[in-house]
Regions:
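Regulatory helix-to-disordered linker/tail regions at the edges of structured cores
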Residues: 60-62
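Short beta-strand elements of ligand-binding domains
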Residues: 65, 86-88
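Charged catalytic cores and adjacent phosphate/nucleic-acid-binding surfaces used
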Residues: 1-34, 42-58, 69-81, 92-212
Length: 212
């Protein structure tokens, strides 16, 4: 039985009631775990206090990495989260992110998927470093047609070599998407259905299990 995980929830409000709304929506949609973006130890403690048997909660901190030095400096400082994700905007930073031991996954905006070339894939493969793509980024891109072309060109090829994680990037419970919606979109874009299922279950679960 697959355990579906939304790997990227970005609450705009960290009150207990707001987080419970995300948990209830996760249950409704069929998720068993959420990975929630945080920026402080206080947020991390609140999220951990709400984690339960029905929906497990994990924390993540995303570094907006515009340079290797910025990425290295910030990743050394962050201590109060389960996972550190590097969102990369250029090739040099993406290559460093693939090598740093304290980076758990690499997030690439859809318009930057050309960064996932053979050299980058090989570096990520050696470290078993997953690639994350946000569902919401696809629909908020300025050029949807070009984004679809990039997904077809780079993501389908990479999916046979490195683990890929699809996340919602939802800021409100209403922005969350069901596993079925995720599968439908990426199947239309040309990804194998079984691999798409892995991207919202097996691949994020494998990463989370390493935290135990």
């Amino acid at each position: 039985m697959r355990i579906f995980i939304d790997f990227n929830i970005k609450p705009t409000n960290y009150s207990k009631d707001s987080l419970l709304e995300f948990i209830n929506m996760a249950l409704h949609l069929g998720y068993r775990a959420l990975v929630m973006e945080i920026s402080s130890n206080e947020e991390a403690e609140l999220i951990k206090s709400l984690s339960g048997k029905r929906v497990k909660l994990y924390t993540r901190y995303t570094i907006l990495a515009h340079s290797p030095s910025e990425l290295k400096k910030t990743s050394r400082k962050v201590r109060w989260t389960d996972l550190i994700i590097a969102e990369c905007f250029n090739q040099e930073t993406a290559r460093i992110a693939a090598k740093l031991e304290n980076i758990h996954a690499i997030l690439i905006p859809p318009e930057k998927l050309s960064l996932i070339n053979e050299r980058q894939i090989n570096s990520m493969k050696m470290k078993e470093r997953p690639l994350e793509i946000k569902f919401m980024d696809i629909f908020y891109t300025q050029n949807l047609q070009n984004t679809i072309r990039l997904i077809a060109k780079y993501l389908i090829s990479a999916s046979s070599k490195i683990p890929i994680i699809i996340s919602s990037g939802a800021k409100e419970p209403s922005e969350m998407r069901s596993p079925r919606d995720m599968i439908a979109l990426f199947s239309i874009l040309g990804l194998n259905q079984e691999k798409t299922l892995d991207m919202i279950s097996k691949n994020p679960y494998s990463l989370i299990r390493r935290l135990a």
